[in-house]
């Protein structure tokens, strides 16, 4: 009488289960997004929710902060997007679109989850005022330098004219 232990099908099933056990962790690891991939997905979501006419594309990604290894923990992100020439209704990827000259720039901050199965993000974007502030600082510095230079020139003219006045002999 044969037992199940002697059955060749039991050996095959054991081998199949062993192989599945080895392959499954690899499948789980493959579902974890990189930091940049998670940000690009978040930008896709931003483009879908946007009421603006054109798509936005990643302009600048801030360095990745140190993170724990848990892909289900929200990770902080900050990046800048810029308006492209592609209308929001296009089927093109934003990466295939050129930036719009003088397009709107937005600063985005929030969190993403790297687990591809959860595909979750919480991002808010505001018009990037840093560029305007930098331009304002530039003009203020130019004004200060010109103003300071004009004062010096004015003082030198005064001194020069003061030396031209004839001196009376006592």
Swiss-Prot record:
Residues 31-131 form a propeptide. Residues 150-162 are annotated as: Active core. This is Cathelicidin antimicrobial peptide. Belongs to the cathelicidin family. PROSITE patterns: CATHELICIDINS_1, CATHELICIDINS_2. Gene3D superfamilies: 3.10.450.10. It is found in: Secreted; Vesicle. GO terms for biological process: antimicrobial humoral immune response mediated by antimicrobial peptide; defense response to Gram-negative bacterium; defense response to Gram-positive bacterium; innate immune response; neutrophil activation. Proteolytically cleaved by proteinase PRTN3 into antibacterial peptide LL-37. Proteolytically cleaved by cathepsin CTSG and neutrophil elastase ELANE. Antimicrobial protein that is an integral component of the innate immune system. Binds to bacterial lipopolysaccharides (LPS). Acts via neutrophil N-formyl peptide receptors to enhance the release of CXCL2. Postsecretory processing generates multiple cathelicidin antimicrobial peptides with various lengths which act as a topical antimicrobial defense in sweat on skin. The unprocessed precursor form, cathelicidin antimicrobial peptide, inhibits the growth of Gram-negative E.coli and E.aerogenes with efficiencies comparable to that of the mature peptide LL-37 (in vitro). Pfam families: CAP18_C, Cathelicidins. It comes from the Eukaryota. Residues 1-30 form the signal peptide. One of its GO terms (molecular function) is lipopolysaccharide binding. Disulfide bonds join 86-97, 108-125. SUPFAM superfamilies: Cystatin/monellin (SSF54403). The cathelin-like domain (CLD), which is the propeptide part, does not seem to exhibit auto-inhibitory function, as it does not inhibit the antibacterial activity of antibacterial peptide LL-37. Keywords: Antibiotic, Antimicrobial, Cleavage on pair of basic residues, Disulfide bond, Immunity, Innate immunity, Secreted, Signal. One of its GO terms (cellular component) is vesicle.
């Amino acid at each position: 009488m044969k037992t199940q232990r002697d059955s060749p099908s039991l050996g095959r099933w054991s081998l199949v289960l062993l192989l599945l056990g080895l392959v499954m962790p690899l499948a789980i690891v493959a579902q974890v997004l990189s930091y940049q991939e998670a940000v690009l997905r978040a930008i896709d979501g931003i483009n879908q929710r946007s009421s603006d006419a054109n798509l936005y594309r990643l302009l600048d990604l801030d360095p990745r902060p140190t993170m724990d290894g848990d892909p289900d923990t929200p990770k902080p992100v900050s990046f800048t997007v810029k308006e492209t020439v592609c209308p929001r209704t296009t089927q093109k990827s934003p990466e295939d679109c050129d930036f719009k000259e003088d397009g709107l720039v937005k600063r985005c901050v929030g969190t993403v989850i790297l687990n591809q199965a959860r595909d979750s993000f919480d991002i808010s974007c505001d018009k990037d005022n840093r560029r305007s502030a930098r331009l304002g600082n530039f003009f203020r510095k130019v004004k200060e330098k010109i103003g300071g230079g004009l004062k010096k020139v004015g003082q030198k003219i005064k001194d020069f004219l003061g030396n031209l006045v004839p001196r009376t002999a006592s």
